[in-house]
UniProtKB/Swiss-Prot annotation:
It comes from Caenorhabditis elegans. Its main location: membrane. It comes from the Eukaryota. This is Uncharacterized protein B0310.3. Residues 54-64 have a biased composition (Low complexity). The chain crosses the membrane at residues 362-382.
Length: 417
C-alpha cells in the first residue's frame, strides 16, 4: 500500500459513493454542490494545477438531481436523434483521436532528456484515485481519473523512400500513343542485319535457302541496266473526216402533202425499209463509215430522214453525226467504254379495222365450210341429191338388208342414187 489508501486498486465505486454521502450529511447541505462523475478519458481540464490534480475532466456522469429532470425522461427527449451513420461515426472517432494526441502532448512532463531521445506517454495498468483538498464550498471535492506515466524513449528516425516525379495523368488514348511511339523508337534503334543480295546475269536475285528471300528495292547503281532502244512516240493525229452519204434512192412512193407527226413518219419509213435494204448495203460498203459499226444506227436514221425531209435538214443531221464521231474518237483515245447505239426497233403497223373484220369473217366462213364437207363425206355418198334426209333413211334400210345377204352380192347396186 502506497501513501494514500485511495490509491488501492481494489477500492470500488460503492465505497466512494458511501463516503461521499457521509460527507454530504456531515455538512448538512444538499447534494447539489457535489458531482460524482465517471472519467471521460482524454479530456484535459486543469492546466494550472498539474501536480495536484490528474488534469482530467469529470463532467460526464451526474449523480445529482439533474438526472431526474424532464429533459432526461424518455417522453420529453425531443433532441435525441436516431443512430448516426458510419461516415459520421468515423469522423467523430477521427476527431477524438486527434484531440487525444494533443492532450497527450500537453500532459507530458518536460524532463531533461538527451538530444537523441524522445518523451512518450505510456498508460498505467489501473485506475488511480486522487483526493484533492480544495475548499471551494467549504468542503473537499473528489476527482476520479486515470493518470498516464511518461517514459523517455530513444528517437528513431527513418528515411522515407522518395517517389519519383509525378507525371500528369493522360487519357487512355494518349497513353497508348505514347507507348506505341516509344516502342517504335526502340525498334528503330535496334540494328538490322544486312542481307547480301546476289543478282544473276539475267537480273534475278539468287535464293540459297529454301525460303524465298524478300525482294528489296535496289539502288540504281547495283541494278544491271539492259540495253534499251529509244523509240520516239509520234503523236497520233486524228483527222476528222466528213462521212460521205450515198445519194438517196427515190422510190415510186406517193409522198403526202399533209405534215405527219413523228410516229406516223416512222411508220411510213418502216414500210419502205425492206425495199431500201439492198440499196443501203451497197452504199455502205462504198462509204468510209462502215468501219465505225457503233454508229450504224445513226446512219440509218439519217437515211430515213433524207427520204422524208428536205436536204438542208439532212445537212444539219450530218453535222450532228460528225460531232458524235469526233467525241467518240476522243473517248476511245482516253480509253473509255462507249455504249453501243442500237438501231431503232421496227414498229409494225397495226391492222386497220376493215381488214381485221374481213379476215375474221373469212375465217369463220371457212370453218363452217370445212365442217359441212366433213359431214357430207361421212353421212352421204357420192352423187347425193338435195333431199338428203330421206335418202339417208333409205340407205340405212338397204344396208340392213345387205347385212343378211351373202358377201358376193354387191352392196352398191341396192343403194338409191
Amino acid at each position: 500500500m502506497e501513501g494514500n489508501f485511495l490509491n488501492n486498486p481494489w477500492i470500488n465505486c460503492c465505497f466512494v459513493t458511501t463516503y461521499a454521502g457521509v460527507v454530504a450529511q456531515y455538512f448538512k447541505k444538499g447534494a447539489e454542490w457535489f458531482n460524482f462523475t465517471t472519467p471521460s478519458i482524454g479530456t484535459f481540464t486543469n492546466e494550472q494545477n498539474e501536480e495536484d490534480s490528474s488534469n482530467y475532466s469529470t463532467s460526464g456522469y451526474d449523480s445529482s438531481a439533474e438526472t431526474i429532470s424532464a429533459n432526461s425522461s424518455p417522453i420529453n427527449r425531443s433532441g435525441v436523434r436516431s443512430r448516426i451513420s458510419q461516415k459520421q461515426r468515423q469522423r467523430i472517432l477521427k476527431e477524438a483521436h486527434f484531440k487525444a494526441q494533443q492532450l497527450n502532448r500537453k500532459m507530458v512532463v518536460q524532463k531533461s532528456c538527451p538530444p537523441d531521445h524522445e518523451i512518450k506517454p505510456v498508460p498505467s495498468k489501473f485506475y488511480q484515485f486522487d483526493a484533492i483538498t480544495d475548499f471551494g464550498f467549504g468542503g473537499p471535492v473528489l476527482l476520479v481519473g486515470m493518470q498516464k506515466d511518461v517514459e523517455v524513449m530513444k528517437l528513431e528516425t527513418k528515411e522515407k523512400a522518395r517517389s519519383g516525379r509525378k507525371k500528369n495523368r493522360k487519357s487512355k488514348y494518349k497513353c497508348n500513343m505514347y507507348k506505341m511511339t516509344k516502342l517504335a523508337q526502340i525498334v528503330a534503334k535496334i540494328p538490322k542485319k544486312k542481307e547480301v543480295i546476289e543478282i544473276d546475269e539475267d537480273g534475278f536475285q539468287k535464293v540459297s535457302s529454301k525460303k524465298a528471300a524478300k525482294l528489296r528495292t535496289l539502288k540504281p547503281a547495283d541494278v544491271p541496266t539492259p540495253p534499251t532502244k529509244v523509240v520516239e512516240n509520234k503523236e497520233e493525229v486524228i483527222k476528222l473526216e466528213v462521212i460521205e452519204q450515198p445519194e438517196p434512192i427515190v422510190l415510186p412512193v406517193s409522198t403526202p402533202t399533209v405534215t405527219f407527226s413523228r410516229f406516223e413518219e416512222m411508220k411510213r419509213v418502216v414500210k419502205v425499209e425492206k425495199a431500201q435494204e439492198s440499196a443501203k448495203t451497197k452504199a455502205l460498203k462504198k462509204s468510209k463509215a462502215i468501219s465505225i459499226s457503233r454508229h450504224v444506227g445513226f446512219l440509218q436514221i439519217l437515211e430515213k430522214l433524207e427520204e422524208t425531209e428536205e436536204k438542208p435538214q439532212v445537212e444539219n443531221e450530218k453535222k450532228v453525226v460528225v460531232k458524235h464521231v469526233q467525241s467518240a474518237r476522243k473517248n476511245q483515245k482516253k480509253g473509255r467504254k462507249n455504249r453501243k447505239v442500237e438501231p431503232p426497233k421496227e414498229e409494225f403497223e397495226p391492222y386497220e379495222e376493215d381488214h381485221y373484220n374481213f379476215k375474221r369473217y373469212f375465217l369463220i366462213i371457212g370453218v363452217y365450210v370445212l365442217v359441212f364437207i366433213y359431214v357430207c363425206t361421212n353421212v352421204l355418198t357420192v352423187g347425193v341429191s338435195y333431199e338428203f334426209p330421206y335418202i339417208t333413211l333409205a340407205n340405212k334400210n338397204v344396208r340392213a338388208i345387205n347385212s343378211t345377204l351373202p358377201k358376193s352380192v354387191n352392196e352398191s347396186s341396192f343403194l338409191i342414187r
